[in-house]
Amino acid sequence: EFASAARAVKKADPKASLTYFSSDPNFLAGLVRQAGGRWYDVTDSTVKVIMTQDAASRKVADFWQKLINEGSIPVHEGYTPQVYKQMNEDTLISELYGIWDTALIAQNVPKGKGKWAVAPLPEWPDRPGGADMGGSATVVLKGSKNAEAAVRFATWMSTDPQAVSILISKGGLWPASTTGLANKALQKPDAFYSNDKVFVPFIDVAKNLKYDWVWGPTQVQAGQDMENNLVKVSKSYPMTKALADTQESTLAKLKKQGIKVG
């Protein structure tokens, strides 16, 4: 259904696209996770990198590659002026990102006020449900002059209901705890989105997420490598090749750090 919609948009207006494939590695990771896949198998003694062997990863890659090859969907870097320009011009009419993207679109696409809405991610028939995309952590660095105060502030910012309300309403951030799903800020209408309660559709999604995804120990570097590869995806450089190249460089970095690979 999603693929048919992408083709219909391109047929109706060759300058427009339903969405784009983002080179952000967290984007692909979220799609793979939703499809039931994984990139790593980690034990106490070894790390297996299985980006190319994973069936769900291949399924997701093949789905998007077909749309890219036929010209229905472009490949872009995320969060760029080019993307927001196309959104303001109504030539890029949706974005498959995390709930925090509601705030970014509202900030960067002023001409889209009243035109945009929020919906759950399209689902695979054999695996209904959603997935996380990205995530964040708050860190106090060693050597901080006010480490104790910084830890107290970070704890308040991440756990106090009033602070979490601010993060939700101003940053579009999703509460990390299940108790946070009762935060009243999630029920607040958003003027940019025609006063829809944009967070509400994701409450049930969050309750039913399967937390079985594992990141590798060198994921920061692996993510950078993957982004450099994904931005090149085209007919001549398919997504499966991007995954293979990322797997190869990831294995090399794991071995260089003395980590046993399977």
Model-flagged regions — what are they?
Residues 2-49, 56, 92-94:
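Extracytoplasmic/periplasmic solute-binding protein
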Residues 100-112, 124-228, 261:
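C-terminal lobe and pocket-closing loops
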Residues 1-3, 75-89, 123:
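Short helix-initiation/N-cap motifs at beta->coil->alpha
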Residues 4-8, 46-77, 121:
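Glycine-centered hinge/linker elements that transmit conformational signals in sensory
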Residues 69, 205-262:
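Conserved C-terminal helix/tail region of periplasmic/extracytoplasmic solute-binding proteins
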Residues 3-16, 84-88, 101-109, 251-255:
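Pocket-flanking alpha-helical
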Residues 11-23, 160-170, 252-262:
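Bilobed periplasmic-binding protein-like "clamshell/Venus-flytrap" ligand-binding domains
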